[in-house]
């Protein structure tokens, strides 16, 4: 009565007895002897031991290969699991195999800790498996009790997981840190736009260089097959062709008035109090100083004869996060401030990127642009970037396609919010590219308003706490 795949039993059962079950057809394909006490579609062709008379119209003798060709290739029609478009049998089989692998890979139950309600749908879809979807809790005690009872892993968002990991693992419970993947959405997470990809890191997090992460371990230790690297190259080319980035914030490419015949350098701004900036900060970036100011000054000093373009981070510009620079100061240190120009447009016109740890550096690498790194992002230290900081754990040289295979194929999980199914990165890329080129959804506008409201509420709470002190 257990849930067991028939294919796991065929090696143990050389002979199958059935009335008309589909099990008998699959047993034939597996090479088993099949006795039928009914007359299913696969009986009467000389392949089965038939205990009832066959219809006169089944007069021909067929091979198992001919039977499979008739059933799978000529009789059935197939549709893409995510886009509902006609596909051939081989493609349908590959897609079903992917969905099966994704489902079975989640054999361990999961107890979710303090995961926001709007994120739970994506997390559930990516972690659903034989043990069922995650069970979400608000308190740590309830989470740990559930984990002990069901022998579950604990999943928590970002630095919540990093901070609690020692306590959780001290009890013999596995802990996963969740964060957005690198092909995320059309719009910001702060605007409650659902993610197309998430990472579930069992060691650290990709933006925390103080400890290993799963993606760092993949790059430091794993090997990649030729097929994986070919797939990575294809994925990279498609990303560049579709001009897809992490958030894909669209807008009109405002003319920047760049001097003709002069090379340009992009300096992407970051959120100054983001964990990606605060943890593992090199001594050359003193704590308490605006990372964007230091970075911009260095870029200008390193490229005095080039046009330095500063792109403020959208969360800083739109949602008031930390890291803003005084306008007069900006005018002195940046040749151009590209506030409303989409990052994908900038990556098509610059010849160099100077970054602290922005994902724009990774996106520039995908496009073949030289990148100088002043912090310790996951893509630094592998021989692909000019690194200002030491990366002692990352001594292995990697190719760009190996980096893509690790960061975009092996490390994240992907989810298609339209079908509700787990999906490979190619499907997520197509969804993002199509959404990026289509009209903005009304929910996106509502999300931006709600996102700004959340930021304002946080500010008010911080102010109130300061007054109470």
Which residue ranges define each predicted feature?
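Catalytic-core helical/loop segments in enzymes performing group transfer/polymerization on anionic/lipid-linked
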Residues: 1-469
């Amino acid at each position: 009565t257990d849930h067991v795949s028939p294919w796991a039993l065929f090696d143990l059962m050389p002979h199958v007895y059935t009335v008309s079950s589909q099990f008998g057809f699959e047993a034939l394909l597996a090479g088993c002897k099949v006795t039928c006490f009914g007359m299913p579609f696969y009986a009467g062709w000389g392949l089965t031991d038939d205990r009832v008379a066959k219809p006169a119209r089944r007069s021909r003798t067929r091979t198992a290969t001919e039977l499979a060709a008739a059933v799978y290739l000529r009789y059935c029609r197939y549709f893409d699991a995510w886009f509902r478009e006609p596909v051939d049998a081989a493609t349908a089989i590959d897609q079903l195999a992917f969905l099966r692998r994704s489902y079975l890979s989640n054999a361990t139950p999961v107890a979710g800790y303090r995961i926001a309600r709007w994120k739970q749908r994506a997390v559930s879809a990516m972690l659903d498996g034989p043990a069922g979807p995650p069970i979400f809790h608000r308190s740590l005690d309830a989470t740990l009790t559930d984990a002990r009872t069901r022998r579950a892993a604990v999943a928590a968002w970002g630095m919540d997981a990093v901070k609690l990991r020692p306590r959780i693992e001290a009890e013999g419970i596995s802990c996963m840190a969740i964060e957005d993947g690198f092909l995320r959405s059309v719009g910001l997470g702060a605007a409650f736009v659902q993610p197309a990809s998430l990472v579930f890191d069992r060691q650290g997090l990709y933006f925390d260089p103080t400890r290993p992460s799963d993606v760092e371990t993949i790059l430091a230790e794993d090997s990649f097959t030729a097929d994986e690297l070919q797939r990575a190259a294809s994925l990279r080319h498609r990303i560049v062709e579709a001009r897809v980035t992490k958030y894909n914030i669209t807008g009109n490419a405002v003319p920047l008035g760049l001097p003709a015949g002069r090379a340009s350098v992009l300096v992407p701004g970051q959120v100054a109090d983001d964990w990606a900036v605060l943890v593992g900060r090199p001594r050359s970036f003193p704590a308490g100083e605006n990372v964007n100011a230091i970075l911009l000054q260095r870029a200008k000093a390193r490229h005095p004869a080039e046009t330095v373009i500063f792109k403020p981070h959208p969360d800083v510009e739109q949602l008031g996060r930390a890291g803003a620079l005084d306008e007069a100061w900006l005018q002195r240190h940046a040749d151009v401030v590209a506030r409303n120009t989409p990052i994908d447009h900038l990556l098509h016109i610059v010849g160099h990127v100077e970054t602290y740890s922005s994902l724009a550096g990774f996106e520039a690498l995908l496009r073949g642009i030289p990148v100088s790194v002043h912090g310790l992002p996951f893509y630094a230290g592998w021989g692909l970037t000019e690194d200002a900081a030491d990366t002692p754990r990352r001594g292995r040289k990697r190719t760009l396609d190996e980096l893509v295979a690790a960061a975009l194929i092996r490390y994240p999980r992907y989810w298609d919010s339209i079908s509700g199914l787990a999906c490979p990165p190619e499907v997520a890329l197509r969804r993002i590219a199509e959404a990026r080129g289509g009209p903005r959804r009304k929910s996106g506008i509502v999300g931006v308003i709600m996102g700004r409201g959340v930021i304002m509420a946080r500010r008010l709470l911080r102010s109130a706490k300061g007054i109470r002190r």
